[in-house]
Protein backbone atom coordinates (compact mmCIF):
# COMPACT_ATOMS: atom_id res chain seq x y z
CA UNK A 1 0.00 0.00 0.00
CA UNK A 2 2.92 2.35 0.69
CA UNK A 3 4.07 2.08 -2.93
CA UNK A 4 0.56 2.75 -4.23
CA UNK A 5 0.26 5.86 -2.07
CA UNK A 6 3.69 7.06 -3.15
CA UNK A 7 2.63 6.62 -6.77
CA UNK A 8 -0.58 8.58 -6.19
CA UNK A 9 1.39 11.32 -4.40
CA UNK A 10 3.78 11.55 -7.37
CA UNK A 11 0.91 11.81 -9.85
CA UNK A 12 -0.80 14.44 -7.66
CA UNK A 13 2.37 16.55 -7.59
CA UNK A 14 2.63 16.37 -11.38
CA UNK A 15 -1.04 17.28 -11.74
CA UNK A 16 -0.57 20.33 -9.50
CA UNK A 17 2.36 21.45 -11.66
CA UNK A 18 0.38 20.96 -14.87
CA UNK A 19 -2.71 22.66 -13.47
CA UNK A 20 -0.55 25.59 -12.40
CA UNK A 21 0.66 25.89 -16.00
CA UNK A 22 -2.92 25.61 -17.28
CA UNK A 23 -4.08 28.41 -14.98
CA UNK A 24 -1.13 30.51 -16.13
CA UNK A 25 -2.60 30.28 -19.62
CA UNK A 26 -5.98 31.31 -18.20
CA UNK A 27 -4.29 34.39 -16.72
CA UNK A 28 -2.79 35.19 -20.14
CA UNK A 29 -6.18 34.74 -21.82
CA UNK A 30 -7.76 37.11 -19.31
CA UNK A 31 -5.22 39.79 -20.22
CA UNK A 32 -5.73 39.27 -23.97
CA UNK A 33 -9.52 39.09 -24.24
CA UNK A 34 -11.13 42.43 -25.05
CA UNK A 35 -14.16 42.16 -22.76
CA UNK A 36 -15.59 40.04 -19.95
CA UNK A 37 -18.18 38.42 -22.23
CA UNK A 38 -15.34 36.87 -24.24
CA UNK A 39 -14.16 34.89 -21.20
CA UNK A 40 -16.94 32.30 -21.48
CA UNK A 41 -16.55 30.65 -24.88
CA UNK A 42 -18.95 27.73 -25.27
CA UNK A 43 -17.42 26.72 -28.60
CA UNK A 44 -13.99 26.42 -26.97
CA UNK A 45 -15.46 24.49 -24.04
CA UNK A 46 -17.05 21.98 -26.42
CA UNK A 47 -13.78 21.73 -28.35
CA UNK A 48 -11.77 20.97 -25.20
CA UNK A 49 -14.30 18.37 -24.05
CA UNK A 50 -14.19 16.69 -27.48
CA UNK A 51 -10.38 16.58 -27.42
CA UNK A 52 -10.40 15.15 -23.91
CA UNK A 53 -12.94 12.51 -24.94
CA UNK A 54 -10.80 11.55 -27.91
CA UNK A 55 -7.65 11.35 -25.78
CA UNK A 56 -9.44 9.28 -23.14
CA UNK A 57 -10.71 6.85 -25.78
CA UNK A 58 -7.24 6.57 -27.31
CA UNK A 59 -5.59 5.97 -23.93
CA UNK A 60 -8.23 3.59 -22.60
CA UNK A 61 -9.29 5.93 -19.79
CA UNK A 62 -12.90 6.10 -18.58
CA UNK A 63 -14.44 8.71 -20.88
CA UNK A 64 -17.38 9.56 -18.61
CA UNK A 65 -15.03 10.11 -15.68
CA UNK A 66 -12.81 12.40 -17.76
CA UNK A 67 -15.88 14.33 -18.97
CA UNK A 68 -16.99 14.96 -15.38
CA UNK A 69 -13.52 16.00 -14.26
CA UNK A 70 -13.02 18.30 -17.24
CA UNK A 71 -16.47 19.86 -16.94
CA UNK A 72 -15.51 20.91 -13.40
CA UNK A 73 -12.01 21.97 -14.48
CA UNK A 74 -13.32 24.11 -17.31
CA UNK A 75 -15.94 25.82 -15.15
CA UNK A 76 -13.31 26.47 -12.46
CA UNK A 77 -10.97 27.82 -15.14
CA UNK A 78 -13.66 30.16 -16.46
CA UNK A 79 -14.37 31.46 -12.95
CA UNK A 80 -10.64 31.99 -12.39
CA UNK A 81 -10.26 33.75 -15.72
CA UNK A 82 -13.19 36.05 -14.95
CA UNK A 83 -11.64 36.93 -11.59
CA UNK A 84 -8.31 37.60 -13.29
CA UNK A 85 -10.03 39.67 -16.00
CA UNK A 86 -11.69 41.81 -13.32
CA UNK A 87 -8.50 42.09 -11.27
CA UNK A 88 -6.39 43.28 -14.20
CA UNK A 89 -8.91 45.95 -15.10
CA UNK A 90 -9.68 47.25 -11.62
Per-segment meaning from a language model:
Residues 1-90:
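Domain-level signature for soluble enzymes in the chorismate/prephenate branch of the shikimate pathway
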Amino acid sequence: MTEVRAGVDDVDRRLVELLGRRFGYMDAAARIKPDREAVRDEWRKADVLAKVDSAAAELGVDRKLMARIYEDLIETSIAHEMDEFDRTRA
